[in-house]
């Protein structure tokens, strides 16, 4: 199971970390994903869901 939101598709984003000298090194920003039990098509499953999807009510915990 990949670290991707099952509802919104949010996942880690990449970019650069900048030092004071403006040197660039690659880094990642992870999405705020929670592993929750939800009902999908009548079955209870454990999936990764973003905190934003949980707060907005797009999915409900079981």
UniProtKB/Swiss-Prot annotation:
HAMAP family attached to this UniProt entry: Ribosomal_bL28
Origin superkingdom: Bacteria
InterPro entries: Bacterial_rp_bL28 (IPR050096), Ribosomal_bL28 (IPR026569), Ribosomal_bL28/bL31-like_sf (IPR034704), Ribosomal_bL28_bact-type (IPR001383), Ribosomal_bL28_sf (IPR037147)
Family: Belongs to the bacterial ribosomal protein bL28 family.
Name of the protein in its database record: Large ribosomal subunit protein bL28
UniProt keywords, alphabetically: Ribonucleoprotein, Ribosomal protein
PANTHER family found in the cross-reference section: 50S RIBOSOMAL PROTEIN L28, LARGE RIBOSOMAL SUBUNIT PROTEIN BL28A
SUPFAM superfamilies: L28p-like
Pfam families assigned: Ribosomal_L28 (PF00830)
One of the GO biological process terms: translation
Record GO terms (molecular function): structural constituent of ribosome
Assigned GO CC terms: ribonucleoprotein complex; ribosome
Annotated spans, Disordered: 1-28
């Amino acid at each position: 199971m990949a670290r991707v939101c099952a509802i919104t598709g949010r996942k880690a984003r990449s970019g650069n970390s900048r030092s004071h000298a403006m040197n660039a090194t690659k880094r990642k920003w992870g999405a705020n994903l929670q592993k929750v039990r939800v009902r999908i098509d009548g079955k209870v499953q454990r999936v990764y869901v973003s905190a934003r999807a949980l707060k907005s009510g797009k999915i409900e915990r079981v």
